[in-house]
């Protein structure tokens, strides 16, 4: 409408100028009877000026304003391939959900000091928010497009390729994956398997209509890992199981805060989780919190920072502290509520406190060099080594595990025939509020 309104104004101006020109020409015609030749020349000059003014007005009318070039992409592609830095060229990413602390400790610092500390942490927060935006956009696509009949390899690689594209780090050059990309391998744990399962090369497993699949993946910018997970099902019979776990995770987020004891969070989570039950094939199962799985704090380039957030009552009296980052995750099961290591290992990470030992196997030495340059202390899986062109590395990898340099993380499973679910968010304990970095419209 604005362009149309400008045209109408130009027409009115042009008509006004033409009208004035006609009146002036008529007046000049009356005066010519008594005027000499020099006056005729002046009339012609005035008429020429009026015509020139009219022509200029016409040209002005025709001249269209130049359209400003739009900088950067305005929306995400499908599948996601546009780096989020192009969607947010000012590098200001959306805040997560802001949650007030339940019982603010006024003695800690003044409100003004807290606000100052928040401003000082801006770069730190922007890196987390960028990773969170990557996670939200990738999982939005995944939730819409993952269907029964797809292989787990296809699903995992689709998610991982999207994360690498949106962070702008493909991870194929030395050091690139340490700057940004996958925070840890995409976990796709099915049914009784609760965590740490991703397909190795050659895996032919296919997602089935009746499966309960936990999708757990991380995106990082400069080692700021956003760890978030959700559960996918294709049968409403599992709805209560998913609701129980989702509500338990939200309870953990609500209870978390500066100076809060881990044990208190675990008790609140368990109370909510185990208030649910689910009916499957005519049998009613109580939903049990998996007592030997926990949430955890996150350090830079380190997914498990040393503190654990239990999901059952009792135990750890450790407190959360200001400035810490936590992955609040809960797991519910229709089985025993206890997991054991099972199936083929796929997840690995170099130990933070890796011992300086002499390695005899050249394959182990070479592989450690690859791990140091491409992952550091970030978790990786066998497919990532394949992607970097490594082959015949299993002997060397097992040697690094035996030496305590690399930690293996086998899949964790409840009893066969049971179903498990997971929901997880990353939160930052800011001085003034807690920010649920990974929160989205989906969960």
UniProtKB/Swiss-Prot annotation:
Pfam family, one: Peptidase_M24
SUPFAM superfamilies: Creatinase/aminopeptidase, Winged helix' DNA-binding domain
PROSITE patterns for the chain: MAP_2 (PS01202)
The EC number(s) this enzyme carries: 3.4.11.18
Cofactor, how bound (note): Binds 2 divalent metal cations per subunit. Has a high-affinity and a low affinity metal-binding site. The true nature of the physiological cofactor is under debate. The enzyme is active with cobalt, zinc, manganese or divalent iron ions. Most likely, methionine aminopeptidases function as mononuclear Fe(2+)-metalloproteases under physiological conditions, and the catalytically relevant metal-binding site has been assigned to the histidine-containing high-affinity site.
Positions of a divalent metal cation 2 binding: 227, 296, 329, 424
Catalysed reactions, semicolon-separated: Release of N-terminal amino acids, preferentially methionine, from peptides and arylamides
Biased composition (Acidic residues): 33-48
GO molecular function, one term: metalloaminopeptidase activity
Cofactor(s) the protein needs: Co(2+); Zn(2+); Mn(2+); Fe(2+)
Coiled coil, from the record: none
Binding-site residues for a divalent metal cation 1, renumbered to this chain: 216, 227, 424
Region (Disordered): 1-90
HAMAP family membership: MetAP_2_euk
Biological function: Cotranslationally removes the N-terminal methionine from nascent proteins. The N-terminal methionine is often cleaved when the second residue in the primary sequence is small and uncharged (Met-Ala-, Cys, Gly, Pro, Ser, Thr, or Val).
Name of this protein: Methionine aminopeptidase 2-1
């Amino acid at each position: 409408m604005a362009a149309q309104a400008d045209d109408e104004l130009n027409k009115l101006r042009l008509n006004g100028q033409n009208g004035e020109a006609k009146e002036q020409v008529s007046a000049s015609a009356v005066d010519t009877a008594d005027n000499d030749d020099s006056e005729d020349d002046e009339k012609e000059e005035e008429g020429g000026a009026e015509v020139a003014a009219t022509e200029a007005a016409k040209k002005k009318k025709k001249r269209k304003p130049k359209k400003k070039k739009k900088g950067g992409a305005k929306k995400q592609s499908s599948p996601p391939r546009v780096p989020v830095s192009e969607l947010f060229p000012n590098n200001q990413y959306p805040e997560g959900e802001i949650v007030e602390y339940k019982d603010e400790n006024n003695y800690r610092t003044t409100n003004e000091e807290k606000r100052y500390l928040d401003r000082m942490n801006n770069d730190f927060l922007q890196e987390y928010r960028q990773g969170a935006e990557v996670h939200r956009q990738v999982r939005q696509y995944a939730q819409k497009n993952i269907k029964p009949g797809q292989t787990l390899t296809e699903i995992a690689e689709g998610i991982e390729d999207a994360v690498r594209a949106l962070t702008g780090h493909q991870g194929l050059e030395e050091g690139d994956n340490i700057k940004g990309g996958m925070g840890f391998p995409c976990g796709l744990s099915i049914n009784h398997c609760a965590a740490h399962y991703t397909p190795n090369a050659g895996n032919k497993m296919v997602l089935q209509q009746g499966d309960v699949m936990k999708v757990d993946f991380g995106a990082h910018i400069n080692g700021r890992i956003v760890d978030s997970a959700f559960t996918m099902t294709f049968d409403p019979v599992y709805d209560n199981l998913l609701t129980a776990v989702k509500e338990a995770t939200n309870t953990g987020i609500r209870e978390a805060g500066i100076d809060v004891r881990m044990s208190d969070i675990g008790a609140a989570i368990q109370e909510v989780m185990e208030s649910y039950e689910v009916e499957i094939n005519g049998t009613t199962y109580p939903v049990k919190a998996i007592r030997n799985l926990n949430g955890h704090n996150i350090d830079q380039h380190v997914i498990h920072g040393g503190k654990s957030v239990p999901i059952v009552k009792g135990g750890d009296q450790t407190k959360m502290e200001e400035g810490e980052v936590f992955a609040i995750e809960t797991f519910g099961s229709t089985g025993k509520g206890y997991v054991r290591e099972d199936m083929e290992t796929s997840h690995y990470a170099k130990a933070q406190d890796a011992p300086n030992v002499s390695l005899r196997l050249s394959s182990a030495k070479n592989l450690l060099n690859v791990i140091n340059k491409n992952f550091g202390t970030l978790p990786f899986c066998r497919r990532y080594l394949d992607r970097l062109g490594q082959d015949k590395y299993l002997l060397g990898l097992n040697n690094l595990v035996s030496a305590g340099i690399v930690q293996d993380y086998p899949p964790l499973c409840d009893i066969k025939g049971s179903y498990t679910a997971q929901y997880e968010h990353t939160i930052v304990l800011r001085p003034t509020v807690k920010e649920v970095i990974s929160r989205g419209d989906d969960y």
